[in-house]
Amino acid sequence: MECGGALQLPPGFRFHPTDDELVMYYLCRKCGGLPLAAPVIAEVDLYKFNPWDLPERAMGGEKEWYFFSPRDRKYPNGQRPNRAAGTGYWKATGADKPVGSPRAVAIKKALVFYAGKPPKGVKTNWIMHEYRLADVDRSAAARKLSKSSHNALRLDDWVLCRIYNKKGVIERYDTVDAGEDVKPAAAAAAAKGGRIGGGGGAAAMKVELSDYGFYDQEPESEMLCFDRSGSADRDSMPRLHTDSSGSEHVLSPSPSPDDFPGGGDHDYAESQPSGGCGGWPGVDWAAVGDDGFVIDSSLFELPSPAAFSRAAGDGAAFGDMFTYLQKPF
């Protein structure tokens, strides 16, 4: 199929090439001035946009998008690329990976997008894999020779990029003023009927999800959260949430003063194993604290030698031990 024509594929087909296929059949042909088999990769200057604005500029894709982009240099006569993009910047992470065997044809670099201005940018979930040709002379002398040939952009200045979000959704991070603080788009939240929760700082930053609106950070699994009302409302019980599969936490109604010795109005939570029977035998309910938890003082007492004598029938075996424990150190 001629490059530039309409791409017609049956339903169910996805563009999901490997690293070697991206380099051999797309990057090398692009840098060699050869046409591609199908127009599946758009030419976009990635450093003019935020990553969440790129999916709509791609030829296609659902959770990852591919682009040919020119290499923008930080300095006119240098080789260091300019990583500023949109309202943030891309930052390299990890080591470069050679692509091709036995000889590397290209270099794969992983980058993470930070919203805001360095060095206070907020790390996002947007990832870019940049593929560039290996063993290419990008020195100032080579570029000067290229300009003398009236080439505004050398073919080997093209890079192939894969963009995706680790969460599989389109997250938007909006900045205010000079990009010092990164905040969600409140106007977009109001338009979508989303919600913005409390909290501050980068760790609690809310983001806009194109599929799910706004979200707050959810508690991690294995966390217990008691949502208890005020002390004035003694009839309302604390709500217990748990992800643990080892036991079931059952909320019981407040016992009446006639049910337990000592009387009083106490809230309590009863924990019983799965498939087992409830009840804590031997618990002094009069010792229940105001916070709703049972404190059995007998659990913290040191057994006396007499108790061991009754258990073992002869306390002589434990006499020396208790004599030693009672000595000051």
UniProtKB/Swiss-Prot annotation:
<comment type="subunit">
    <text>Interacts with NAC048 and NAC002.</text>
</comment>
<comment type="function">
    <text>Transcription activator that binds to the promoter of the stress response gene LEA19. Involved in tolerance to abiotic stresses.</text>
</comment>
<dbReference type="GO" id="GO:0003677">
    <property type="term" value="F:DNA binding"/>
</dbReference>
<dbReference type="GO" id="GO:1901002">
    <property type="term" value="P:positive regulation of response to salt stress"/>
</dbReference>
<keyword id="KW-0010">Activator</keyword>
<keyword id="KW-0238">DNA-binding</keyword>
<keyword id="KW-0539">Nucleus</keyword>
<feature type="region of interest" description="Disordered">
    <location>
        <begin position="228"/>
        <end position="281"/>
    </location>
</feature>
<feature type="domain" description="NAC">
    <location>
        <begin position="9"/>
        <end position="166"/>
    </location>
</feature>
<dbReference type="Pfam" id="PF02365">
    <property type="entry name" value="NAM"/>
</dbReference>
<dbReference type="InterPro" id="IPR003441">
    <property type="entry name" value="NAC-dom"/>
</dbReference>
<feature type="compositionally biased region" description="Basic and acidic residues">
    <location>
        <begin position="230"/>
        <end position="242"/>
    </location>
</feature>
<protein>
    <recommendedName>
        <fullName>NAC domain-containing protein 71</fullName>
    </recommendedName>
</protein>
<keyword id="KW-0805">Transcription regulation</keyword>
<keyword id="KW-0346">Stress response</keyword>
<dbReference type="GO" id="GO:0045893">
    <property type="term" value="P:positive regulation of DNA-templated transcription"/>
</dbReference>
<dbReference type="InterPro" id="IPR036093">
    <property type="entry name" value="NAC_dom_sf"/>
</dbReference>
<keyword id="KW-0804">Transcription</keyword>
<dbReference type="GO" id="GO:0005634">
    <property type="term" value="C:nucleus"/>
</dbReference>
